[in-house]
């Protein structure tokens, strides 16, 4: 994989720098690097494809090295160089695609395509440019079973989950109390509601709690916490728990009280925040526990009192909510996030070439299903194919 990255980096730089009119001395270093690539691969043959609808392609290498000149690069020089560079770029692209569409239950971090396995041969180790890519560094570490670390912006660590639970429900469904939530990607919205507005709760205080397990441990996270849950606090028709009826959710928004957010690791509280909104920091955690209260206003104007009667029917739902967003974090496991298109690249290629469902990934690379069952095998394969996708993205920009 590191050889493939070095090839891509060299070819990307060569394509950008070897242009007509450039003084040769300004590009002599990259020309020599390209010549090293040519000398290393000349005489080799490779084959890519042959899975799903991905066509088989045979690659042969017999190129002359790029020459030197005391003058500026002319059109003929650049045209000859581009012919060589473009062929090599097509080859690297095909190797990346061939790697992205393959998976294995055992040792999924290792190259799975014949072409990438062949590039692991010692003769190609002379190809060396710059292996400082975060993905290459982590791939090498994971390959040696050492700790890795990815910096993530809005990590997609939460599987989609939109549901509710009722702690009180009368048969007519006009007097309910419970919580409703939406978890997805890096964001949690949670709302607690009570038709009675805590009228019969102890001390006129209704308490709510929501626990969200992570699928991986996050470290050094920056988190934002805001009152209200705008996606959840709108009028809606909601099915009953048994699915046999529906009820009208008609929220009236109040501000939550006694808000507490706990970040836990293996069941132990690591970081705890009380009555604090805005930007929070969490050292390391694998679950989040959010608790808050709905307090019935002790004093209400006639207009407000009419919203929350003291006897049935109860036409409205007093509602308090919170929104928590994981803005950034580090993780030892590779995840998709807001900064990188690699999940889209991988999914698109597997769909384009009708790659059959294998033993590791779910159909269509369904991210929610993948996270819900994020095994060691999936982690290894995902790290490998995301690394290949990161290399491919360098040369197709």
Curated annotation (Swiss-Prot):
Zn(2+) binds at residue 153. One of its GO terms (cellular component) is viral intermediate capsid. One of its GO terms (biological process) is fusion of virus membrane with host plasma membrane. It is found in: Virion. InterPro entries: Capsid_hemagglutn, Rotavirus_A/C_VP6, Virus_capsid_a-hlx_vir. The keyword Zinc applies. Intermediate capsid protein that self assembles to form an icosahedral capsid with a T=13 symmetry, which consists of 230 trimers of VP6, with channels at each of its five-fold vertices. This capsid constitutes the middle concentric layer of the viral mature particle. The innermost VP2 capsid and the intermediate VP6 capsid remain intact following cell entry to protect the dsRNA from degradation and to prevent unfavorable antiviral responses in the host cell during all the replication cycle of the virus. The keyword Nucleotide-binding does not apply. This is Intermediate capsid protein VP6. It comes from Rotavirus A (strain RVA/Turkey/Ireland/Ty-1/1978/G7P[17]). Signal peptide: none annotated. Keywords: Calcium, Capsid protein, Intermediate capsid protein, Metal-binding, Ubl conjugation, Virion, Zinc. Homotrimer. Interacts with the inner capsid protein VP2. Interacts with the outer capsid glycoprotein VP7. Interacts with the outer capsid protein VP5*. Pfam families: Rota_Capsid_VP6. Residues 62-73 are annotated as: Interaction with the inner capsid protein VP2. The VP6 trimer contains a zinc ion located at the center of the molecule. The zinc ion is not essential for either trimerization or transcription activity of the DLP. Zinc-depleted VP6 has an increased sensitivity to proteases. The N-terminus is blocked.
């Amino acid at each position: 994989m590191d050889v493939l990255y070095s090839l891509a980096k060299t070819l990307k730089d060569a394509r950008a720098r070897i242009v007509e009119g450039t003084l040769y001395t300004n590009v002599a270093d990259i020309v020599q690097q390209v010549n090293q690539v040519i000398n290393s691969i000349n005489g080799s043959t490779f084959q890519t494809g042959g899975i799903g609808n991905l066509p088989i392609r045979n690659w042969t290498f017999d190129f002359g090295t790029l020459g030197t000149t005391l003058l500026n690069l002319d059109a003929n020089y650049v045209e000859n160089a581009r012919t060589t560079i473009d062929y090599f770029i097509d080859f690297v692209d095909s190797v990346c695609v061939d790697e992205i569409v393959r998976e294995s239950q055992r040792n999924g971090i290792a190259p799975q395509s014949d072409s990438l396995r062949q590039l692991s041969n010692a003769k190609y180790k002379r190809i060396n440019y710059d292996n400082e890519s975060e993905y290459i560094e982590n791939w090498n570490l994971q390959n040696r079973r050492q700790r890795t670390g990815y910096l993530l912006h809005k990590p997609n660590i939460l599987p989609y989950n939109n549901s509710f639970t009722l702690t009180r429900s009368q048969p007519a469904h006009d007097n309910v109390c419970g919580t409703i939530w939406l978890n997805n990607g890096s964001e949690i919205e949670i709302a607690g509601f009570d038709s009675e507005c805590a009228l019969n709760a102890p001390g006129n205080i209704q308490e709510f709690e929501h626990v969200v397990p992570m699928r991986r441990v996050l470290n050094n996270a920056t988190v934002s916490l805001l009152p209200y849950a705008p996606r959840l606090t709108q009028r809606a028709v909601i099915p009953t728990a048994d699915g046999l009826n529906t009820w009208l959710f008609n929220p009236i928004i109040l501000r939550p009280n006694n808000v507490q957010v706990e970040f836990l690791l293996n069941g132990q509280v690591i970081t705890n925040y009380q009555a604090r909104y805005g930007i929070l920091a969490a050292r390391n955690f694998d679950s989040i526990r959010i608790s808050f209260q709905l307090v019935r206003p002790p004093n209400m104007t006639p207009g407000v009192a009419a919203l929350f009667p003291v006897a049935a029917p109860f036409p409205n739902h007093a509602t308090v909510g919170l929104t928590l967003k994981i803005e950034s974090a580090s993780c030892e496991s590779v995840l998709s996030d807001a900064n990188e298109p690699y999940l889209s690249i991988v999914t698109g290629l597997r769909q384009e070439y009708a790659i059959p469902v294998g033993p590791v990934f779910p159909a269509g690379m369904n991210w929610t299903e993948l996270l819900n069952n994020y095994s060691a095998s999936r982690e290894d394969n995902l790290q490998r194919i995301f690394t290949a996708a990161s290399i491919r993205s360098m040369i197709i920009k």
